[in-house]
Each structure stands twice: as C-alpha cells, then as structure tokens.
C-alpha cells in the first residue's frame, strides 16, 4: 500500500483512535467515572459517552466483517459477521449480569428486546419506507419461510417453554434442559447455514438482485483499497476496545435504571439497541434502494444469529458465574411475543409487501415500548 492509500486509510478509520482513547480513559479512571456516588450529570455523561462509543465502534466492526464476508465467501463470511455481533452482545449481557446479580432476567429481556426491535422496529421501518417509495416490493418467499421456520421454534422454546416446565421453580430450566436448549440452538443454526450457503442458496436471493448474503455497509465508508487481511486487522482493532467498553457499560446501565427508577427490562432494550442498530441502518438503506431481499436477509438473518448463538453462550456464562437465569416471559411480554411471531408469519407469507404491513409492525413496536413502562 502506497503513502496516499495509507493516509486515506488512516482518515477513514479516525474513530479507532476515539475508541482506543475511550478505552484507555476507562482503564485508568473507570472507577471514578462509574462511581455510584458520582453526580447525576457525570453519570449521564458517562452513560451517553459509552453508548455512543460502543455503538459507532460496533458499526465499524460490522462494516469490516461485511467486507471480509464479501472477500472470503460463505460460510466463513457469515460466521465472521455473526460471531462479531454476538461477541459484542455477549460482553454487554455478561457485564450487566456481573454488576446486577439481583436481575436474573437480563438475558431474557435482551433476547426479547432483540426480537421486538428487529421483527417490529427494523422490519416495520424497512417495509414502510420501502413501500412508501416503491409502492410494492418483492422478496423470495422460500427464504423468508426458512428463516421463520427456525426463529419461531427457537423463540418459543427459549422464552415460552420455561414457563411450563416443572423440574425447577419459576420461569427457569433445569441444567439438562438448558444444555438441550443450547445444543438445539447451535444445531439448528448449523443446519440453517448449510441450507443458506449450499443446497438452497437461491432461496435467499431474488432474480435480478445480487446474492442474498450481501449487506448494506454501515458505519462509514469502506477503507479505500484495503485488502482482506487489513480488514481482518481493523476488525480485531475495533473488537478489542468495543468488547472492553461493553463490559464497562454494565455499571452505567445499572446506575441509570436505579436512578430513574426505570423497569429492569430497559437494560435489555439498551443492549439490544446497540446490537441491532448497525444492521438496522443497512436494512433500511436496502429497502429504500428497492432491494427488499437484502433487507429481509439482514433483518431475519441477524435475528436468527442473535438467538441461536447468544443463548448457548450465555448459558455457559451463567454456569461459570453460578448465576440463575430466568428465561420464560410473563404477562404482556408473553402476549407481545406470540402476536409478533404470528404477524411476522402473515407478513412474510405472500412474497410482496406494502405500506400497511410496515405500519402494523411499527405499531407493535410502539406498543412494546409503551408496555415496558406501563405494562
């Protein structure tokens, strides 16, 4: 790489310096910045600072993972992308679990929030803006059905079934039930990858569009002239501070919830928003560009990967920590999950979308947000 290309690369990756500087600041002064006795204004600034630093760094991680996916092909490309996003989410959930041992619902709340944000927020926005600009849009019905055929049983087995087991008290699973759930998640995701990248690759593309694995890049422009190994190094360079900062984010989330007397489920929403936003931006851009197939792949693909990979990983973390995790949803959350899954099956049952379908999903997302505070 020549000097000009190097300068362009440095300019395009300016946020890496911000991310590293933020990590050093919390490494050196983290205890003071996150102290429970700190002024409310200081705590608010720390919370916003960390949230924005993690969010933008995560967008950069996703961007470089997407470039690697394009260069390395499948299934390695898909695995890199999903593992990068899952690592960020797992670090965030683990941090909250460590600092809030009296909140055993954080994993459940985060998984549920991811489902609501993606299936209602991201899908609703993508369908609405896409149909508003292009009236009706098409996608491959078989691919959408395959996504949902895996998402629905994983969501039901992990978030509803624990309410009806009798081996342990409360909305929990026994050790062997948790192990089965983890193995089932990994097994179904492996089978899905085999279908997506091999035997039925065409189900995830629409005639006239490029291969359905593509993602709309987010987090800034691509590093100019960067090779695969440079994208790999930059991905690792961003991943180290973003995982560290995600671990530091546990205390500010806990402080914010206690200071505002907010519901504990809000912590899961914040973590889910960090994970879903980078790909959500790509999904909306794709819908606006009349590439709904790509948007569907981004939304449903990221949801499936999040559920299938985060649950087994967090089960292992909970065992290592000796922590109890509540999985079963209760009350209005239970109803919202069933309603969202049912509406999603109807939405992705025709191969074409319109404004009304997007509006319905967005209304469900607004209802979800309302019920967090008024449930």
PLM regions and their residue ranges:
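Hydrophobic alpha-helical segments, chiefly the membrane-spanning helices
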Residues: 1-375
